[in-house]
Amino acid sequence: MELVVKSVAAASVKTATLVLPVGENRKLGAVAKAVDQASEGAISAVLKRGDLAGKPGQTLLLQNLPGLKAERVLLVGSGKEEALGDRAWRKLVASVAGVLKGLNGTDAVLALDDIAVSNRDAHYGKYRLLAETLLDGEYVFDRFKSQKAEPRALKKVTLLADKAGQAEVERAVKHASAIASGMAFTRDLGNLPPNLCHPSFLAEQAKELGKAHKALKVEVLDEKKIKDLGMGAFYAVGQGSDQPPRLIMLNYQGGKKADKPFVLVGKGITFDTGGISLKPGAGMDEMKYDMCGAASVFGTLRAVLELQLPINLVCLLACAENMPSGGATRPGDIVTTMSGQTVEILNTDAEGRLVLCDTLTYAERFKPQAVIDIATLTGACIVALGSHTSGLMGNNDDLVGQLLDAGKRADDRAWQLPLFDEYQEQLDSPFADMGNIGGPKAGTITAGCFLSRFAKAYNWAHMDIAGTAWVSGGKDKGATGRPVPLLTQYLLDRAGA
């Protein structure tokens, strides 16, 4: 779908469908009133019959109104005069998109300037959410269906904005398009089956991306290099699988050479059986989504490349497959990490932190401004925060605050959890420097505490996306593309874009 921005009178546009808001009690805003006058009062006459009350998301389709060049007019309820919240605004836009998808029109014009959204400016903020909602709603994953989805008739949507705000709406659409592109790539990777999407496949995806962008350098460390670097924890996770582990580095140079980079670290467990600490069979198919941290880093990088942000960014994807076999790691094994610290592996199903800890040590060599790791790390995070909010921890309050703010602005929220010293004691081991689990209490926090021991050399934050990376079961099952909006917003803010 192509999104364009124009500043013209709604009553004069030639289109298959013109979309106008109607407030509660059938109240028309300035734009809708002008269109109503051009149609000789046809819109207000229909409203007087009571066919549309104006509640948020309600729709009414009108055909062939006099005095207009639009073939159809779609009225959408915008509620009371008070500003809509983010959720209500997204629902309204999704409602409009649902109607438009059912029509044969190839284009539509949205004249929604009269709607206010709380805590969003009238141009960039409001239309950024609108554009992301429209574009993300276009996503379809039918690669393995013998019968593909029918191509949608709607190819172009024009957003009408006043002249004063046109440039800001265009900027919003530009950013939203890049974010939606990154989210779609993230969702594609997450939804792929694990027999195809393994560590070597992700490495090939990185190389293809590197070939397409001169500012991007790609390096892949194989299992021998991982072992030679002393990454004993990382290596241990993949040693039970026929698919060897890979540490994938993508280095984007968009800023000045002397600028310190931001580093994103993604957990890329392409399938997680739990290893010898085997998971229950029910729902195990969804463990293909255990690489969604790495997928979201990939997607964020795609957005950054599309926007050509003037920053330096290093993406590290820690990829492995966690399988049981005669060569797999056993509960009770002790490994030495790249940092020199030793870990007793008490549970092989707590493997994400093992690939991440060595990758966090590896990140030191880039002398980063900040390091953010993203991982589907703990089921405990789903218990604590559900599927709406990502968990967030870190060793620097400014960094954590910037990420929380980015989440609010991108409508991709996170919530901070503590890393108090008292929790560290739960990781004590009688045989090694630490265990890889901290017992049944505060599982998300103790996982963060574990990682914090390998991130002391820089400002660091950890995002647990176990509850937000995918939707389980049902017709909507699949990867969500989160937290690409949050991460991209954070980098947009750092770039001043």
UniProtKB/Swiss-Prot annotation:
Details of cofactor binding: Binds 2 manganese ions per subunit.
Chief site of localization: cytoplasm
Keyword flag Transmembrane helix: no
Protein location: Cytoplasm
Active site residues per record: 279, 353
Record's GO cellular component terms: cytoplasm
Pfam families for this protein: Peptidase_M17, Peptidase_M17_N
SUPFAM superfamilies to which the protein is assigned, alphabetical: Macro domain-like (SSF52949), Zn-dependent exopeptidases (SSF53187)
Gene Ontology annotations of biological process type: proteolysis
UniProt-recorded Gene Ontology molecular function terms: manganese ion binding; metalloaminopeptidase activity
Chain positions recorded as Mn(2+) 2 binding sites: 267, 272, 290, 351
Enzyme Commission code(s) on record: 3.4.11.1, 3.4.11.10
PROSITE patterns: CYTOSOL_AP
Alphabetic keyword roster: Aminopeptidase, Cytoplasm, Hydrolase, Manganese, Metal-binding, Protease
Function as written in the Swiss-Prot or TrEMBL entry: Presumably involved in the processing and regular turnover of intracellular proteins. Catalyzes the removal of unsubstituted N-terminal amino acids from various peptides.
UniProt similarity note: Belongs to the peptidase M17 family.
Official protein name in the record: Probable cytosol aminopeptidase
Organism of provenance: Pseudomonas putida (strain ATCC 700007 / DSM 6899 / JCM 31910 / BCRC 17059 / LMG 24140 / F1)
Phylogenetic lineage: Bacteria, Pseudomonadati, Pseudomonadota, Gammaproteobacteria, Pseudomonadales
